[in-house]
């Protein structure tokens, strides 16, 4: 399993929501699929764009357990921006 960092812009009515997520997955495609399943409602939302990069815990210069805890905290509140269009 790899960890991927995704920035997802979702449009709903006149609002853009930006999600910043860390997803554990075997591939980029699996990470995107998980986002579709967990955060996206096809009936009322459209995806503007998705940026996916592979994330390495060593990029954070902390231990794996600390990185896992930080990632869990960040994923608990994934919507970081809402913008009226």
Located regions from the model:
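Short aromatic-glycine-(Arg/Gly/Cys) micro-motifs in beta-strand/loop hairpins
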Residues: 1-18
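Extended low-polarity, hydrophobic cluster-rich segments
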Residues: 7-8, 22-24, 52-55
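A short, charged, amphipathic alpha-helix used as a generic interaction element across diverse proteins
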Residues: 26-48
